[in-house]
């Protein structure tokens, strides 16, 4: 018999999400590779075998075993769009929205992103780390084992670089594997009011090269984890021409690209982002069906963020059903942030996607594992249970994976395993 460090066996459902390399589209988003009475063998941080329990247990002798009888086991979840490094909160603005104020009205009055900017600029790197750690612990308890984290609340050189430094420290301080994104073009800072082009000059000519230089000597680069560059292409933020400058500069620096597009208004940012080879385009709440063919023909992931529409009390959600049926590779994420989506729960995101985006439970799982991993450059490493992949798994407090989406606001995760180690036990 071969030795292994951990053997999880007797799973009522072993949901592998296994399949050929690459994004899942259309019917493939419903193929979960479920094994009844399944087992997973782990050596170090890597999966070495997946299959029927009798086969795997006959082959491996384990230092430690977990009996998953009566449980479903699935890949760790991937949250591919978050803004969790910031100072302060927006509790008062929440009440303003309850009284009828819109997101755009609050932002125009100096709130929203700009309020968080002021508090984040005043915070030290250590303070940002201490503020974000409890958020990451909560994400982990909900089953997130890999997460993208953006800057974008500094909106000036030093504060944006402090956010990058905080992300690196957070990556080393807790189990969730982080992927950094530089989002200096998140909003026009107040000192550049009426001069958005001048701010883009600063981002392109100074901030992006500094971010690239920071990344080159970072622990992320040493592990081949990418640094993405993102831009908020939206009315009241940056127009298509300004957004193009940011993404074009990122391409020139050899950095992969993302874009917030079509959240409130279709400006043409989606076509621009596809032209520039964006890894993902995020939000797409008002994207019309005429764009789906080009999106489906691309290698770009459509990252949908339904908690934003829910939290803002909007009547429309991204057209996920039509996108999937058209062959678009769809991912889901929390968009965890202090204003438009103050939630850290991917299971809640999946539950809302089933109810309001007309996605099937299996599709939401692929959208938060395989496709989400590709949306942040981690496809083939995390997001599925296959030999050679990182041993990131969830043992659910139920015998059916659909409890992840069925229960609204619950805690369906019994144990979280990251890189072969049990890091959370919720029971």
UniProtKB/Swiss-Prot annotation:
Entry binding sites for Fe(3+): 81, 83, 260, 335
* Origin: domain of life: Bacteria
How is this protein named in the record? Imidazolonepropionase
What InterPro entries does UniProt report for this protein, alphabetically?
Answer: Amidohydro-rel, HutI, Metal-dep_hydrolase_composite, Metal_Hydrolase, MQNX/HUTI_composite_N
Give the metabolic or biological pathway. Answer: Amino-acid degradation; L-histidine degradation into L-glutamate; N-formimidoyl-L-glutamate from L-histidine: step 3/3
Binding-site residues for 4-imidazolone-5-propanoate, renumbered to this chain: 90, 153, 186, 263, 340
Q: Where does N-formimidoyl-L-glutamate bind?
A: 153, 337, 339
Native organism: Chloroflexus aggregans (strain MD-66 / DSM 9485)
């Amino acid at each position: 018999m071969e030795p292994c460090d951990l053997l999880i066996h007797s799973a009522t459902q072993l949901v592998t999400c296994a399949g050929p390399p690459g994004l899942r589209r259309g019917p493939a988003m419903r193929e979960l590779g479920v094994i009844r009475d399944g087992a997973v063998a782990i050596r170090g941080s890597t999966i070495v075998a997946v299959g029927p329990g009798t086969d795997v247990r006959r082959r491996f002798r384990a230092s430690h075993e977990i009996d998953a009888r009566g449980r479903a086991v699935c890949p760790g979840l991937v949250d591919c769009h978050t803004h969790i490094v910031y100072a302060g909160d927006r509790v008062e603005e929440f009440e303003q929205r309850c009284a009828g104020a819109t997101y755009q009205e609050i932002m125009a009055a100096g709130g929203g992103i700009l309020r968080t900017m002021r508090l984040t600029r005043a915070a030290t790197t250590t303070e940002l780390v201490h503020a974000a750690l409890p958020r990451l612990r909560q994400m982990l308890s909900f089953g997130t084992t890999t997460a993208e984290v953006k800057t974008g609340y500094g909106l000036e050189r030093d504060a944006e670089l402090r956010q990058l430094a905080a992300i690196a420290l957070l990556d080393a301080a807790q189990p969730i594997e982080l992927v950094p994104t530089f989002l200096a073009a998140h909003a026009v800072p107040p000192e550049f009011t009426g001069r958005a082009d001048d701010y883009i000059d600063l981002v392109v000519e100074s901030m992006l090269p500094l971010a690239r230089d920071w990344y080159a000597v970072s622990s992320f680069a040493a592990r081949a984890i990418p640094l993405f560059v993102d831009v908020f292409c939206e009315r009241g933020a940056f127009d298509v021409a300004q957004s193009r400058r940011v993404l074009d500069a990122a391409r020139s620096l050899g950095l992969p690209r993302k874009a917030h597009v079509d959240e409130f208004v279709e400006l043409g940012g989606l076509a621009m982002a596809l032209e520039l080879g964006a890894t993902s385009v995020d939000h797409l709440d008002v994207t019309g069906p005429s764009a789906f063919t080009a999106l489906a023909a691309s290698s770009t992931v459509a990252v949908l963020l339904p908690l934003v529409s829910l939290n803002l009390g909007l009547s429309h959600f991204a057209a996920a059903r039509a996108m999937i049926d058209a062959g678009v590779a769809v991912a889901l994420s929390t968009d965890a942030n202090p204003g438009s989506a103050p939630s850290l729960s991917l299971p809640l995101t999946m539950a809302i996607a089933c109810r309001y985006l007309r996605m099937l439970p299996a599709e939401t799982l692929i959208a938060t594992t395989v496709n989400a991993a590709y949306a942040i450059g981690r496809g083939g490493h995390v997001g599925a249970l296959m030999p050679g992949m990182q041993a990131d798994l969830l043992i659910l407090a139920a015998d059916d994976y659909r409890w992840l989406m069925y229960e609204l606001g619950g805690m369906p995760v019994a144990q979280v395993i990251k890189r072969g180690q049990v890091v959370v036990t919720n029971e």
